[in-house]
Design a protein with these regions (language model features):
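Sec-dependent signal peptide cleavage junction
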Residues: 15-27
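Surface-exposed amphipathic alpha-helical segments
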Residues: 29, 34-38, 131-168
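Positively charged n-region of N-terminal signal peptides that target proteins for export
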Residues: 1-4
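Signature of long, low-cysteine stretches enriched in small and polar/charged residues
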Residues: 79-126
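Short glycine-aromatic motifs
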Residues: 36-40, 85-88, 101, 156
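Short, solvent-exposed coil/turn segments at beta-strand boundaries
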Residues: 33-36, 56-59, 97-99, 122-129
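Secretory pathway targeting signatures of secreted, lumenal, and periplasmic proteins
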Residues: 27-76, 109-114
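Bacterial N-terminal signal peptides
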Residues: 8-16
Length: 168
């Protein structure tokens, strides 16, 4: 009985180690943020998910997220995080770092809050979903917002994952 328990413990540790090793090699999205960006949140979860939030000038912020399950969709993000979104427009985006990507720009006027313009980019990388979410107060104007978002989207890349290995 002791040998069985010992082998079960060893097997559990091996599987746990393999899971953590897989997370370390999981892809992450790289984005060149404006110089004034300040990280205000950096949370990693045991399942491989993570959230990084950066505060920008003018009340804007950017979030970089990784979901270990790749079943995340832009429609799901909009429905869950931005109900009542209007003026939803697709971005001209097909790949980021060799992985399939899609993007949306949308407007949201939350009740009792300032209207915002939101940019979302979803990259399907290996078994993960990488998400870029930029939120700008609408008062900054569409031209300034679109320019800032376009510069960040143009700088996007993916570090790690199988597509990066194949490019070599």
């Amino acid at each position: 009985m002791k040998k069985i328990l010992m082998w079960l413990t060893v097997l559990t540790l091996m599987l746990t180690g393999a899971a953590f090793a897989d997370q370390e090699n999981a892809p992450v999205m790289l984005v060149k943020l404006p110089e004034d960006a300040q990280m205000v949140e950096n949370v990693a979860f045991d399942d491989g998910d993570f959230i990084q939030t950066y505060q920008l000038s003018g009340g804007a912020y950017v979030q970089l997220l990784r979901y270990a399950q790749g079943d995340v969709t832009l429609d799901g993000i909009v429905a869950g995080d931005w109900p009542g979104a209007t003026d939803i427009q697709s971005m001209a985006l097909e790949t980021v770092g060799g992985y399939a990507a899609k993007g949306l720009m949308l407007s949201v006027e939350p009740e009792d809050e300032e209207a915002v313009r939101v940019a979302l980019v979803l990259v399907s990388a290996d078994r993960c979903a990488l998400v870029y979410q930029a939120v700008y107060p609408q008062r900054l104007g569409d031209d300034q917002i679109d320019d800032a978002v376009q510069r960040m989207v143009d700088s996007m890349d993916v570090l790690g994952g199988s597509a990066a290995k194949d490019v070599g």
